[in-house]
């Protein structure tokens, strides 16, 4: 997972083993500033079935025990453990592989083809590059993973249906649908 600071790296190093023990993966670590900083950790199940509230609560309790000893954030802060949501951030190459065929927004740390923001359909991963099929373009655009600072799935009906199906809650059929 890509992080934005050495502090995020330290938090991630503490959180990942705890997540692994619970069959979870850390999707993103962020510290939100304010009067009282908020440490936000997004997690998901490693089996792809989606994290539940109970999983978040267990992970939060386990992290609190570790963070109480290691103290990765100076001063008082609030710990928030949450699901990445349906329109989740993509932070690792395996995320881009897993969500191939879905629409995504990507922001880069530098210009590519004269811009930093892209939107299109994920077209796979090859040699550390993320493939993106964009409207009006004949060729797949290959973006170096290392240039990506933010990437997020776009909420679509197909994405919602895929999420429901993965959780075993596929769309209900009505009498005329059969």
Curated annotation (Swiss-Prot):
GO CC annotation terms, alphabetical: cytosol
Keyword vocabulary terms for this entry: Cytoplasm, Ribosome biogenesis
Presence of the UniProt keyword Metal-binding in the record: no
Compartment(s): Cytoplasm
Highest rank taxon of the organism: Bacteria
NCBIfam families: PRK00092.2-5
The protein's role, per its UniProt record: Required for maturation of 30S ribosomal subunits.
PANTHER family membership: RIBOSOME MATURATION FACTOR RIMP
Protein name as annotated: Ribosome maturation factor RimP
Gene: rimP
């Amino acid at each position: 997972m890509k992080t934005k600071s050495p502090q995020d790296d330290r938090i991630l190093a503490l959180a990942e083993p705890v997540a692994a023990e619970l069959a979870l993966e850390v999707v993103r670590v962020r510290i939100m500033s304010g009067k009282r900083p908020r440490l936000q950790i997004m997690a998901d199940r490693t089996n792809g079935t989606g994290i539940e509230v109970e999983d978040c609560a267990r992970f939060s309790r386990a992290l609190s025990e570790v963070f109480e000893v290691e103290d990765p954030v100076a001063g008082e802060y609030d710990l928030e453990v949450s699901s990445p949501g349906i329109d989740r951030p993509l932070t690792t190459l395996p995320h881009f592989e897993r969500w191939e065929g879905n629409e995504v927004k990507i922001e880069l740390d530098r210009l590519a083809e004269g811009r930093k923001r892209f939107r299109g359909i994920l077209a796979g991963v090859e040699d550390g590059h993320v493939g993106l099929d964009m409207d009006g373009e004949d060729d797949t655009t290959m973006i170096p993973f290392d240039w990506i600072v933010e990437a997020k799935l776009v909420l679509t009906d197909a994405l919602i249906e895929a999420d429901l199906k993965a959780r075993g809650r596929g769309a209900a059929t009505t009498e005329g649908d059969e």
